[in-house]
Amino acid sequence: CYNAALTLERAVMSVVLQTHLQHIIIVDDGSRDHTVATAQRFPAAYPNKIRVACLPQNGGVARARNWGMLVSNAEIVAFLDADDAYQAQVLAFSHAVMQFRPDLPALRLGLIPVDLDAKYSAHPQFDYGWRHVEMTVGGNMVFRRAFLLACGGFPQDELFRRLGGEDVALGLAVLASSQMGTAFDDVGLDEIAVLHHCRPDMYAYKLLDGVLFGLGRSDITKADQQEAQAVTDGIVSRLQQLHQWLHTEHKGKVPLKVELAPK
């Protein structure tokens, strides 16, 4: 979280009330307000459930998420932005999905917009546009930790600190390499979702501007797009290489013969 003192309690309490919760790791990403002081109240109230990690300087959302993943020892990790909140039973549902679908390494939860600008919600293609948001942002993602580690975590390239989109690059790599469950294509799942509290500068608005109104981002160049694609391709390549290592026909010791060149 970064400068999230006003919303952090709402987010944390929505997680504390969940079942199937192992622990909460609050990662402060060099906040300049009183986020740290707010965060440090929670371990005292929930000493066995909540830990706080404070990064010395702001390094971006990808680094904060990755730090939380590294500190955790849970088999399944879920990411919630500090200005959002879970509906009840989100983690119980996520746990059940991972238990009954061991083939799925990742899951995207539904997003319910709160205080969304009316110019978007009134658009006739809003549902179509919002599906793009649900498949793009990082605050509704659940991973098997081992798989996310194999991906290298969320990409921390400077490109994404400048423009956002680290969750897009990772999500595309997952879709190209494996499977990702989605919990928003069934009408019966609308009460198991993330409450996405909207703010004027949120990434989702930029995405909706493009999908619904055809407004491109002037700050993104073709070179930026190529660099982002290269990051996605790199994650896919690492996963493919890992698959080759783990599915080799011959397992065990491999004696190597070395011949030294004559001097």
Q: What residue spans do the PLM features occupy?
A:
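Glycine-rich, basic loop-to-helix element that forms the pyrophosphate-binding segment
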Residues: L55-S72
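Acidic helix N-cap motif at the loop->helix transition within catalytic regions
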Residues: L6-R10, D33-F42, A85, Q89
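A conserved acidic beta->alpha catalytic loop
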Residues: S14, D28-T38, Q57, D81
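Acidic donor-binding loop at a coil-to-helix junction in glycosyltransferase catalytic cores
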Residues: R161-L172
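Conserved donor NDP-sugar-binding/catalytic core segment of glycosyltransferases
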Residues: Q89-S121
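Short aromatic/hydrophobic "clamp" motif used to bind/position activated sugar donors
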Residues: V77
